[in-house]
């Protein structure tokens, strides 16, 4: 009688979809107004000149120009600017 008894089921085997976070436009890149520069959770990058911040902390360009990453302040925060 070489039979197997019914195996128990597992409660694993699921995974969530990737959130597609990260930098979308890098320093020195020329981008149009409205382009998403960074998608992030919290303010890892802070908005600078000619840049807006969405309610989910997405940083986007408000004008056409070149992307610039700058560290400033005592805490060395990274600010993103758009230089025309």
UniProtKB/Swiss-Prot annotation:
<protein>
    <recommendedName>
        <fullName>Large ribosomal subunit protein bL27</fullName>
    </recommendedName>
</protein>
<keyword id="KW-0689">Ribosomal protein</keyword>
<keyword id="KW-0687">Ribonucleoprotein</keyword>
<dbReference type="GO" id="GO:0022625">
    <property type="term" value="C:cytosolic large ribosomal subunit"/>
</dbReference>
<dbReference type="Pfam" id="PF01016">
    <property type="entry name" value="Ribosomal_L27"/>
</dbReference>
<dbReference type="InterPro" id="IPR018261">
    <property type="entry name" value="Ribosomal_bL27_CS"/>
</dbReference>
<dbReference type="InterPro" id="IPR001684">
    <property type="entry name" value="Ribosomal_bL27"/>
</dbReference>
<dbReference type="GO" id="GO:0006412">
    <property type="term" value="P:translation"/>
</dbReference>
<comment type="similarity">
    <text>Belongs to the bacterial ribosomal protein bL27 family.</text>
</comment>
<dbReference type="GO" id="GO:0003735">
    <property type="term" value="F:structural constituent of ribosome"/>
</dbReference>
């Amino acid at each position: 009688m070489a039979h197997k008894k019914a195996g128990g089921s597992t409660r694993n085997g699921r995974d969530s979809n990737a959130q597609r976070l990260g930098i979308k436009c890098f320093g020195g890149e020329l981008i149009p107004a409205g382009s998403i520069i960074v998608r992030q959770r919290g303010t890892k990058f802070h908005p600078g000149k000619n840049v807006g911040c969405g309610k989910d902390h997405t940083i986007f360009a408000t004008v056409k120009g070149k992307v610039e990453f700058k560290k400033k302040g005592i805490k060395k925060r990274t600010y993103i600017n758009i230089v025309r």
